[in-house]
A protein has these predicted regions:
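STAS-typified acidic loop motif
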Residues: 4-26
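A short, well-ordered alpha-helical element
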Residues: 19-39
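Amphipathic alpha-helical interaction surfaces in cytosolic regulatory modules
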Residues: 47-92
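Short acidic-hydrophobic, aromatic-tinged amphipathic segments that line or gate anion-handling sites
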Residues: 95-105
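N-terminal loops that bind phosphate or other acidic moieties
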Residues: 106-110
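Intrinsically disordered or compositionally simple regulatory linkers and C-terminal tails
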Residues: 111-121
Length: 121
């Protein structure tokens, strides 16, 4: 896990995910949110080659658990192939904020914290 900004954690996930690994990651992320008092968690799945039904369900449960703790969650790195798989599996991501890449997710997170980034002139 990486602290990107005060109040913003990122969890880059790499490699094949199974239910056990996803569960361990969820528990670690929830504890880290408590430890740091972070308001927003970004789960980046750019490095995940495929998502099956069980993994997608664990991700949704993680988002729900994060919300129950009073924080927001953004899933980034949703590539076209993964998006098609999720739609094909009939999974309901309504209400889950997703972004195509980590940069867009961080931009949204900072906006939600009331921060803006601008280039120095």
């Amino acid at each position: 896990m990486v602290k990107l900004w005060d109040g913003v954690l990122a969890l880059p996930m790499i490699g094949t995910l199974d239910s056990q690994r996803t569960q361990v990651v969820m528990e670690s992320l929830l504890q880290r949110i408590v430890d740091t008092g972070s308001e927003i968690a970004i789960i980046d799945i750019t490095g995940v080659p495929t998502v099956d039904t069980l993994v997608a369900q664990h991700l949704l449960k993680t988002v729900t658990a994060i919300r129950l703790m009073g924080a927001d969650c953004i899933i980034s790195g949703v590539r076209p192939q993964i998006a098609q798989t999720i739609v094909h599996l009939g999974l309901d991501l309504q209400g889950v904020v997703t972004k195509a890449n980590l940069a867009d997710a961080l931009k949204l997170a900072l906006t939600r914290l009331g921060l803006t980034i601008s280039k120095a002139v």
